[in-house]
Amino acid sequence: MNLRGKQKRFLRARASHLQPLFAVGKEGLTANWLAQLDGALDRRELIKVNILQNADVTTDEVKDFIEGQTDIQVVQTIGRVLALFKVSANKDMRHLSDQVKKI
């Protein structure tokens, strides 16, 4: 699902109240971390990821890694925090994506 500007704005507003659920540390980006991230997005659809100061990767590298390996979309980047969105594979969990489609 490609997001339009209004849809991203809606998701950014929703993400502003969330706390980061995942962190990227000195271990960097691994396939296991990405699998856990993907599983969490299947349940929540919208989460935040914090890039710790001791991480060896930049925000752009994390964004490129996530978007290149999966169908997760980066909705917003503020400093070292990314807001991520993915439509849930489980139809019962698609509350947020149903609202986004109506916009």
Predicted regions and their residues:
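Positively charged, polar, low-complexity stretches
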Residues: M1-I103
